[in-house]
Amino acid sequence: MTKVEYKHTHIAAKKKLGQNFLLDRNIPRKIVRESGIKEGDRVVEIGPGFGALTTAILEVMPSFTAIEKDRELAKFNREEHPQIELIEDDFLKVPLEPLAAGGKLSVLGNIPYSITSPILFRLLDNRHLIASATLMIQHEVAQRIAAVPGTKEYGILAVQMQAFCDVKYLFKVGRAVFKPRPDVDSAVIKMVPKAVDPVKDSEGFRTFVRRVFHQRRKTLLNNLKEYYDTSGVPEPTLKLRAESLSVPALITLFTQLKLIARGDASGQLLLKRRR
């Protein structure tokens, strides 16, 4: 267990919580700049830790909400940053509706690698409450979220996130600026939920995406025929692999399959491989 010293405090980084504390002061300021937050916004920080990002946010915001699960770090932040509203709890369990009562939330955070996916999908599920999310996550995951068709990184995570959010990969962060030093690099991404959901049946779409990418090397026909009536989909389309289709094209295919299921397959689906 690695003990991290900051000012008057020695706190052991807890491996089970995936704690890696950011030591560099310039990176948090860059994260805040990229987030675009301004005074008056409803800002929520996930896991302030020793307050590197907290301090940078306070240069812009006189007060905001931070959610910290670790009891020792929650106590530290109450003492070090009394102007913030500190919620000592797990972000995955905190109700977001009350926090967004005054406006949509701008979420920032240095996210533990071990719970990146649960946090991302919690934000996605609550996208109607979110103005933006600017997050530092594992570099490999950031690449997968921002991936484009035809690349090895492009898959379920990219499609599910990009279908409902505008996603931007901002910059890479080397592992040397953390203590304890992680085994991998990090990166900062920004996600902004789309003003209008392009898919009404979001749960059905998630299931569809998991199915089309279940076996990446198989064609759409082979991945879908067990679950959907594909009779109204042009044969050239069914010969494609999911990894070759853009997010809008996959949304169009899903919509067409739902029309076919309802017996309303008017018109033919026109899908083109991304060049």
From Swiss-Prot:
Its EC number is 2.1.1.182. Its main location: cytoplasm. The keyword RNA-binding applies. GO terms for cellular component: cytosol. It comes from the Bacteria. One of its GO terms (molecular function) is 16S rRNA (adenine(1518)-N(6)/adenine(1519)-N(6))-dimethyltransferase activity. S-adenosyl-L-methionine binds at N20, L22, G47, E68, D90, N110. It is an enzyme of class 2 (transferase). CDD domains: AdoMet_MTases (cd02440). Keywords: Cytoplasm, Methyltransferase, RNA-binding, rRNA processing, S-adenosyl-L-methionine, Transferase. SUPFAM superfamilies: S-adenosyl-L-methionine-dependent methyltransferases. Specifically dimethylates two adjacent adenosines (A1518 and A1519) in the loop of a conserved hairpin near the 3'-end of 16S rRNA in the 30S particle. May play a critical role in biogenesis of 30S subunits. Belongs to the class I-like SAM-binding methyltransferase superfamily. rRNA adenine N(6)-methyltransferase family. RsmA subfamily. This is Ribosomal RNA small subunit methyltransferase A. It comes from Chlorobaculum tepidum (strain ATCC 49652 / DSM 12025 / NBRC 103806 / TLS) (Chlorobium tepidum). The gene is rsmA.
